[in-house]
Amino acid sequence: MVRTLGPPTWFLTFSCNDLNWLDMLKALLIADGRDIDDAEHLSFPERLNLVQKHPVVIARQFTLRVNALMRFLKRNKDCLGGPIEDFWYRVEFQNRGSPHLHMLVWCSNIPEFSTPEGIAVIERVVSCSLNPNDSTLRKLVEDLQIHKHTATCKKIAKMMVVALIFQDLQAIAPFV
């Protein structure tokens, strides 16, 4: 596609928040034969257990959300700065089974991003600020869009330090 269409206009990711989406939790409870009124009161271990127990429900619910996202993107021709000319996406599954999507989008009538017109498109489409007047949105952004270090991050950081030390040793004694 890149050979035919050129570089994509946008790279998007869409992650499944299977432990917190209320409709997802209700679908999981239905699959488990339980009352959906319990959805908001499930503990973290209970949510995790449901997610691990019903991967097909997770995949189907995620597909419904992806389809809704695609309908939104196609109907709202200016939400990405111009009409979608083409797209490609791939769904992958994280270690615990949660799906996420990586998407390339080609939009038509988008100026080069290095031009003043292109910068205006970026400023209109991309946001990295919090609206202080919308506490619900602020909480969502803080919970879902801000990176928090995990054990995996620390493990990777430790591996990087070991690699750097090894590189330094190689410079001192290349035969090691």
Identify the function of each model-found stretch.
Residues 1-101, 105-176:
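Intrinsic low-complexity, intrinsically disordered terminal tails and linker regions enriched
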